[in-house]
């Protein structure tokens, strides 16, 4: 059972509320929703669920970085309050269309000069599959190339993360670079997806596939 969220200060609560009001302008229209999932802007109350994912080794074992301590709901709320003010990031929750259940995160970081890094993970892994991660990627690509006017989206994936690489290929991403990351102590693959590829609908070429991601395309 998720813990009750208690913002640590009135200031943090006001900051989060202001952030949420500003981010409403970025809400995706309902035509982005498919029969399985939709994405919506992250909210402060999502910390009640996401702090549990931050403490799950199964989610973080395939990523380039991971938490270095146990994360409490208060710590997660403080982190979200800061993150949601960043102008170079856009963060969304992945939710089931039938009941609104929050099952994962998808987001852009390092948004600058027409480029952004994509991250995605399914936190509730028992609810993975059925093309849900793929659908979320297609939706955030729509948002990135239309609302943010991006030219390129890229993802960095550990070579060993077979599920993430399969998801990237199904979404039309092209493998362009391999290198060794000293920080992650692993071989890393860079995948890219361009505006031209989006206009040619390459992300839709393979349809919705059943990809059960373990960690997805790199949560932070």
Task: Show where each model-derived region lies.
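N-terminal polybasic/positive-inside topogenic patches
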Residues: 8, 15-21
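Hydrophobic helix-cap positions at the C-terminus of alpha-helices
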Residues: 53, 82-84, 144
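A short helix-loop-beta-strand connector motif used in the catalytic cores of GNAT acetyltransferases and
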Residues: 81-93
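Acyl-donor (CoA/ACP) binding surface of acyl/acetyltransferases
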Residues: 3, 20-48, 55-56, 91, ...
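Conserved GNAT-fold acetyl-CoA-binding loop/helix
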Residues: 58-79
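Short helix-loop boundary/capping segments at the starts of domains
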Residues: 56-59, 85
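An amphipathic alpha-helix signature
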Residues: 44-51, 73, 77, 81
């Amino acid at each position: 059972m998720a813990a009750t969220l208690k913002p640590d200060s009135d200031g943090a609560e006001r900051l989060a509320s202001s952030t949420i009001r500003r981010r409403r302008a970025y809400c995706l229209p309902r035509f982005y929703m498919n029969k399985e999932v939709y994405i919506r802007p992250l909210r402060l109350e999502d910390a009640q669920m996401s702090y549990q994912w931050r403490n799950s080794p199964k989610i973080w074992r395939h990523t380039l970085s991971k938490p270095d301590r146990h994360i409490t709901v208060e710590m997660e709320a403080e982190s979200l309050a800061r993150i949601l003010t960043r102008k170079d990031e856009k963060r969304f929750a992945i939710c089931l269309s039938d009941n609104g259940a929050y099952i994962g995160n998808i987001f852009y970081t390092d948004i600058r000069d027409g480029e952004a890094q994509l991250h995605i993970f399914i936190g509730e892994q028992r609810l993975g599959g059925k093309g849900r991660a793929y659908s979320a990627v297609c939706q955030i690509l729509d948002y990135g190339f239309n609302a943010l006017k991006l030219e390129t989206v890229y993802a960095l994936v550990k070579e060993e993360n077979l599920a993430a690489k399969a998801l990237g290929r199904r979404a039309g991403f092209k493998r362009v670079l391999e290198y060794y990351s000293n920080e992650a102590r692993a071989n890393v693959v860079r995948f890219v997806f361009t505006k031209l590829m989006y206009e040619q609908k390459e992300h839709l070429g393979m349809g919705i596939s059943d990809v059960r991601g373990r960690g997805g395309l790199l949560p932070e």
